[in-house]
Amino acid sequence: SVGAGQVLHCPYDAQKAKIVVKEMLDLLTLDLVEKHLVTDQIVLTVGYDIENLADPEHRKKYRGEVKADRYGRLVPKHAHGTANLKKKTSSTSQIMEAVLELYDRIVDENLLIRRVYVTANRVVDEQTISEETEFTQMDLFTDYQAVAAEQKAEQEKREKERRLQEAMLSVKKKYGKNAVLKGTNLQEGATMQERNNQIGGHHA
């Protein structure tokens, strides 16, 4: 598996934490591309902050299960889920769409978030899937020309995205991790730019 986790420097609401998840997925998919790997399963774990139960205002909004953290403090039970993809890929857009849909489904938007983990499971070398051939059961009711045109358009879109991913990797290697930043990285709550300036979790 390939993955990453992040402990936020302060509690984030669900919308700000979603920005961090997007950043982590960007990095995860670039990591897959760099290693020539693909996945069809992403696991998302979101840990809530102790303030949710310590603060009376937040406490009365929560009706769910409570767990003790490793220090014995009570916190809402973490959100945990799996996004299964139709086929193995390293596409940022496909992985992002699946995981953000999962995020919206499992995360309690009333709770403050302190930890986020994303992991790509069932990872294999991309060469192994390029050698696989898909067989489709033929029937009389499918417009196979339309299906072929749709598949061709999807393939061209993926190839364009792949070239962009490889270009981003090349620029980051040559000029540093902050040489290419997306609009997401400049939003309030984004952490990638600051994390890129740190070595071993500390400012360089």
Where are these regions (language model features)?
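Basic, low-complexity intrinsically disordered segments
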Residues: S1-A204
